UniProtKB/Swiss-Prot annotation:
Primary enzyme class: transferase
Function of the protein: Catalyzes the formation of N(7)-methylguanine at position 46 (m7G46) in tRNA.
Name the UniProt record assigns to this protein: tRNA (guanine-N(7)-)-methyltransferase
Lineage: Bacteria, Pseudomonadati, Pseudomonadota, Gammaproteobacteria, Lysobacterales
Annotated source species: Xanthomonas oryzae pv. oryzae (strain KACC10331 / KXO85)
Enzyme nomenclature, EC number: 2.1.1.33
Example of a GO MF term: tRNA (guanine(46)-N7)-methyltransferase activity
Top-rank taxon: Bacteria
Keywords assigned: Methyltransferase, S-adenosyl-L-methionine, Transferase, tRNA processing
Length: 252
């Protein structure tokens, strides 16, 4: 089946995950058919070769990718790209990798990166779990950021939430000793699950203490999702964890 065209003629990019025959996998996202504009199509056509990383399923040499050997920050599910763009503008000394499965957001950020003249940002349009498992080496990341992941608020859908024990263990493996994990949510129930999972994960130490959270750090701007949540009366929880150098990646 071919991908659908939007009303202005732009064609959606291929599905951002691999499909294994005979295997049904629970994913933390659903691809919703949103508006994909001609400007976003142009971004994929013209800017993807500069900023995009094609998923190959094999370990990637990030130093070669960026042309320098410095710390790497990964943002999973960057949405419209506002937080990633802000961070890259404020911190040119580190390299930034963004992962997002929804094509309109990727196209929007591609255009923004061109406008900024960014040279230290690369993007995946792919499933974050597959990227981490197959393309990111253990200990390669200085920091992982996960801002307002889908809360899957219906109880029967909780298994789709991104923050699960196996995923947390995967993050520990990919973070360098002394690295940092920063997660934010505006759903109290999801914050509770994050604490349940992350506080219990060997190799992660909650910077605010058990079941603690911090004020929004300066490196995270107030996002669209946060603003929307506050209008609905939601609180916001920023959870910051340090990668304990006393726990090896094989122990996670």
């Amino acid at each position: 089946m071919t991908d659908p065209f939007t009303s202005d003629g732009a064609k959606m990019p291929p599905k951002p995950f691999t499909i294994e025959a005979g295997r049904r996998q629970v994913r933390s996202f659903v691809l919703r058919q949103g508006r994909f504009t001609s400007a976003q199509q142009r971004a994929f056509d013209e800017l993807w070769p500069r900023f995009g990383l094609e998923y190959l399923g094999t370990p990637r040499d990030l130093a070669a990718t960026f042309g320098r050997d410095t710390h790497k920050v990964l943002e999973i599910g960057f949405g419209n790209g506002a937080a990633l763009r802000f961070a890259a503008q404020q911190d040119p000394s580190r390299d930034y990798i963004g992962i997002e499965v929804h094509a309109p957001g990727v196209g929007r950020l591609l255009n923004a990166l061109e406008e900024d003249g960014s040279t230290h940002v690369r993007l995946y349009h792919h499933d974050a779990v597959e990227v981490l498992e197959h393309e990111i080496a253990d200990g390669a990341l200085d920091e992982v950021r996960i801002y307002f992941p889908d809360p899957w608020h219906k109880k029967r859908h909780n298994k789709r939430r991104l923050i699960q024990p196996a995923f947390a263990q995967l993050l520990v493996r990919k973070l360098r000793d002394g690295g940092r994990l920063h997660a934010a949510t505006d759903w109290a129930d999801y914050a509770e699950q994050m604490w349940d999972v992350l506080d219990a994960t060997p190799g992660l130490v909650n910077r605010a203490g058990p079941r603690g959270h911090v004020e929004r750090p300066a490196w995270r701007p107030q996002t669209h999702f946060e603003t929307r949540g506050q209008k609905l009366g939601h609180g916001v929880w920023d959870l910051v964890y340090d990668r304990d150098p006393g726990v090896g990646s094989g122990d996670a």
